[in-house]
Amino acid sequence: MKVLVVYYSMYGHIHRMAEAIVEGAKEVVGAEVVLRRVPETLSHDVLEKMGAVEAQRSMSHIPICTVDELAEADAVIFGSPTRFGNMCGQMRQFLDATGGLWVKGSLIGKVGSVFASSNTQHGGQESTILSFHTTLLHHGMVIVGLPYAFQGQMRNDEITGGSPYGASTVAGTQGERQPTENELAAARYQGKHVASIAYKLVMAR
C-alpha cells in the first residue's frame, strides 16, 4: 500500500508539515510512504527577491513529482500554502496537467487529502484545502480530512492551525513562525488516518 505526499513550499513551513505527515503515515504497518515536491514555476530572480532561495535550496533533495506517480499511489496527500484563499499556482499548474489521468480514470477510488498553511490565523487555510476538493472529486477520489478524534483541534489556549478539513499551520506575516508541536501532531495524525483508510480500501479489493 503506497502513500504519496506531494507538496509545494516556498519558505519551508509546508515542507515541515509534509515531513510530519510522512511520519504519521509510516506508523501504519505495510505503508510505503513517498515524499515529493511539485515543480517550481518562479524564476531564480523572483525567488531571490522574495528571500526564498535558501529555503528552496534546503528542500532540493526532495525529488520532483510526476503526474504518473499519482496513479501509482493508493492515497495522495497534497500540501500547499495559501494564495488569496486558494492553493498556490505551482500546485494548480501540477494538477492541471492531470487530464490524462482523468481520461483513464486512474485516480478513481484512491484516497485524497490536503494540508495547508497561511500567514495569519484566518488567512484562508480552510478555503485553500477546499479548493482542492473540486479537483479531487472530479478525479473520483475519496476525500479524507482530519477528524475531531484529534483532540488538538479543540485547543483554545494557543493560536493553532487545523480543522476537520485538514492539518494546517500559521506561518506569520513574515514567515517567522514555525509549525508548533500541536500543528505537527495534527499532521502526523492526518498522515496515519489517511494511510489507515487507504489500507482498509486496498484490503477490501
UniProtKB/Swiss-Prot annotation:
Catalytic activity: a quinone + NADH + H(+) = a quinol + NAD(+); a quinone + NADPH + H(+) = a quinol + NADP(+)
Origin: domain of life: Bacteria
UniProt-listed PROSITE patterns: FLAVODOXIN_LIKE (PS50902)
Chain ranges of the Flavodoxin-like domain: 3-194
InterPro entries: Flavodoxin/NO_synth (IPR008254), Flavoprotein-like_sf (IPR029039), Flavoprotein_WrbA-like (IPR010089), FMN_Rdtase-like_dom (IPR005025), NQO (IPR037513)
Positions of transmembrane segments: none
Positions with a binding annotation for NAD(+): 11
Positions that bind substrate: 102
Cofactor stoichiometry and binding remark: Binds 1 FMN per monomer.
Protein name stated in the entry: NAD(P)H dehydrogenase (quinone)
